[in-house]
C-alpha cells in the first residue's frame, strides 16, 4: 500500500538513502531503516512531513517493524542526542514544533540515528537509519510545500 502511494507521488529529490516526494497537500522526506525485516515484520521507515498551507512544518513520523508495547517509551537517538516520541501501535511521532526543530537540526549534523522500543511481547526493538542525503531531502520537501499554489 505504501509503495503504491509513493508511485502516485512525484519524486522531487533523491540523495543518499533519502528521497523527497510531493503528494499534493503534503511533501515528505522519507527513508527506510537499514534493517531487513524478518518474515512477519514490517519495513521500518521515517517520514518528515510538511503541509502545503497547513500546520505540519517538519512533523516526524516513524513506522516501527513491530507494534510497540502500550505505555512503553519510544526513543529516537540522533547521534548521541535522545528524543522521547509519542507512540501508538507500530507508529511513533514527534511531540511538537520545538522537538521537531531539534530533531531536524540533529539529523543535519549526524550520520546515523536509531529508534528503540519494546514490542508487545516485551522484546527490545532497534531500528537504525543512515542520514546520508537527509538534509537534501528535507530541504526539497520543505521548499516544495512552502510554494503558494
Q: Which role does the model predict for each range below?
A:
Residues 2, 6-149:
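A generic "folded-domain core" signal
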Amino acid at each position: 500500500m505504501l509503495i503504491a502511494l509513493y508511485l502516485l507521488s512525484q519524486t522531487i529529490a533523491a540523495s543518499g538513502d533519502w528521497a523527497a516526494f510531493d503528494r499534493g497537500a503534503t511533501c515528505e522526506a522519507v527513508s527506510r531503516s537499514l534493517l531487513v525485516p524478518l518474515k512477519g515484520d514490517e519495513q521500518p521507515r521515517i517520514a518528515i512531513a510538511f503541509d502545503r498551507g497547513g500546520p505540519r512544518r517538519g512533523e516526524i513520523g516513524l513506522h516501527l517493524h513491530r507494534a510497540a508495547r502500550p505505555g512503553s517509551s519510544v526513543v529516537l537517538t540522533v547521534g548521541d542526542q535522545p528524543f522521547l516520541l509519542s507512540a501508538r501501535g507500530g507508529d511513533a511521532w514527534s511531540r511538537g514544533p520545538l522537538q521537531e526543530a531539534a530533531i531536524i537540526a540533529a539529523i543535519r549534523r549526524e550520520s546515523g540515528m536509531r529508534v528503540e522500543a519494546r514490542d508487545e511481547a516485551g522484546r527490545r526493538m532497534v531500528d537504525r537509519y543512515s542520514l546520508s542525503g537527509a538534509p537534501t531531502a528535507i530541504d526539497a520537501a520543505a521548499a516544495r510545500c512552502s510554494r503558494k499554489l
